[in-house]
Amino acid sequence: MRPIHIANLDKPRPVVVLTRDLVRSSMTNVTVAPITSTIRGLYSEVRVGQENNLEGPGVISCDNIQTIPRTALGRQIGWLFAKQETALGVAINHAFDLEITSVEAVLQAQQKQGS
């Protein structure tokens, strides 16, 4: 499950940390997706709310993914659930206009490149 932290961006705001746990402590910078209360209904958004330990409803804005200094990452306040993490992958796919239809397709493409 992906952690939700408070980060010092334009103002202190919740973010989902996208950098994987395994390397986060050794990285100078981490990649995050900000959470906002402005809900536009875009495919590049993932709904979150009180079930994620947030104050109210909002969305993860995958159109605004950014890399920040790890030191700008504050305390952890919540987590994404498994179904939200799946939705996050789809939203990132939309935000970057990637032609990925499934994890299996990616793995098959990687195997073909390696042969």
Task: Please report, for each region that a protein language model flagged, where it lies by residue.
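C-terminal terminal-subdomain/extension
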Residues: 52-115
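Compact nucleic-acid interaction/catalytic patches
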Residues: 6, 10-50
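Loop/turn positions that initiate beta-strands
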Residues: 1-4
